[in-house]
Amino acid sequence: MADASRALRATARVAHVLTAALGVVVLVVAAYGMAGELNALRVEGMETFSVRDAAAFVGLLAALLSGSLLLGSAVPRIRIRLPARPLAPEDHPVYGFTTILAIGIGSTLGSPLFLLLPLNVIEYEIVSILSLTLAAILSIAMAKNNSDSYRVLKTNGLAAVGGPAFVRVALGTRSARYFIARFSMAVANTALAAYCVLVFVVFVFGYLPTLLAAYGLGGPPAYYIVAMITVLFAAWFVMNSLLERRYIRLIGRAQLVFTSLLVVILVVQSWLLGSAGGWNFRGLLAFPAASPLDWIGATIVNTGYLYLLFFGFQEIQALDREARDRSPIPVISWIRRGYTVSKERYFGVAMVATVLIAAAVNIFYALAVYVANPSPAGVAASQIPALYVARSVLGGPQEALIALAFMLATFTTFVPAFLAATRHIRSLGEDGFLPHTVARGAWIFVLAAIVFLAAAGQDFLVSITDYMVLVSLGIIALAAVWLRRDRRAAVERKDSLAVGVGLSCLVAAAALYVVTPSVAVFGSVSLAVAFLVYDLYDLGSLGTRLFLAVLDVVTFVLLSAYPRAFVAAGIPVLPGLEAAASGTDGLRIVLLLGGLVLVASFVADVVARAAEPPPEIPDGDGP
């Protein structure tokens, strides 16, 4: 009996090792294929989405899920302890109206402004200005709508961390619409953080050495300056992500200083650029040589593209737990001593004021760039167009000044975006959509996602941020309708603002498909996949294994009928495996093997459970 037991344990250990090895192989094949597809999105985009593309995508998804399950089930005794915060939310009310407003403006006037706006206004002229105005109007309406919903929640003593909280209260934590709103906002903030990291790397390691060399700072001094800025950026990230509670007041003061300097530099630079061009707006009102429907459509599409420059006011709602219940208001509280405003009111004022100030700065800078008339070819060829405009029109000192503004914008945008993404992931964990382990270590998973998304390139990150945030904001706006219970009709006149804003956001998101269909497909599929992962998590061990086994076999048949080659991923492959990894042949093999192993595991588990003796029911004397 003892020998049989030892043999059984040895067989189980061998099975675990083989299962883990198969899981690693499946994950490697899936990672190679996904890296190739991501590289294709970054370089070429995607004009069509054929049946073969769909089959390949489903195959990669099935391989990723199956490989993860095989590897995880084979090593159940391994536990990875991630540095984490307690899952239960904690309040640290230290920020007042001024700090909240500074954080909102800093999150909105981010590094994308320096790359997107100069090129967009040079290329699209009046359409760009109209798009900025339309995006500003939409954001003001959204801020007002969110302010009303926030007031309703706080008046009733409900949590209101982030805009998706409105959807959660209106529809419940198990609503698919709530999940889409929360997850979309998490992806949007993660993509924005990845974009900030990407352009920061381009600036520090590509542009800054050349700028320093122009002032005679080459060699070791330039290396030290680059290293110092990199260390400061890393220290700012660590302070905000890991030491936020300890240094929360210092972080708020730093955000206030950074944002103030950023706004002053942008306003001064805009005035100088406009003065250099004589504020000559000749030709600005010349509409494109196309039909009215064409340029109206172009304006709508461009509005969706530029909305990235305005949605930072959403970060204010994520600071509900860090904001004081009452706060003085600058100037008014100086005149009326002791005057304070409740959080329910000053949050709404801060959101609207953020959009108004950001819109004024964005439009003023866009008009200044237009009248400065820089070389369109030079702007298009520049890695950071705002720096090129400053150098070519105003000279080197102003280029250095706008470079400082760019660094400040990166600091004020990256960290709020990263923290907002982390808070959204944690909220999904609190609501049961994610395992508590993932929620507690949310900052690590967001950081890994930033590294992954950064490989997709700047254009993809801008578009996916726009698409996901517009989808989320559309649902959040409509939550104001769902929140109202005292109604006689499905939609009433008082719902006009919420319905108008929500539908406008969803239309703008749909319009992005015209420009970047790959982004719309990627965003929509990512939402479906994320909800699928939640469903699998909810199924339990047996249900997940059975589902993935069936998915693997079905996908194997699908790939046999519609084979496809993967784009070169740009990552090394083991010698002799290039042919298998470059097409769906290798993917089909690992899917078939994974499906068979999962079926065997499912059957063995069912048989083992059936063989277990039923639990003994203790005898009782009865009532």
Which residues make up each language-model segment?
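Transmembrane helix-boundary motif of multi-pass solute transporters/channels
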Residues: 26-53, 92-202, 307, 316, ...
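TM-loop-TM module centered on a large, flexible mid-protein loop between adjacent transmembrane helices
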Residues: 161-174, 209-210, 334-341, 350-415, ...
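Membrane-interface "cap" regions at the ends of multi-pass membrane proteins
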Residues: 2-129, 139-144, 329, 335-345, ...
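C-terminal membrane-solvent junction of multi-pass transporters and transport-like membrane proteins
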Residues: 4-19, 86-94, 248, 439, ...
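Membrane-interface loop-to-helix entry segments
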Residues: 11-22, 53-62, 73-76, 224-276, ...
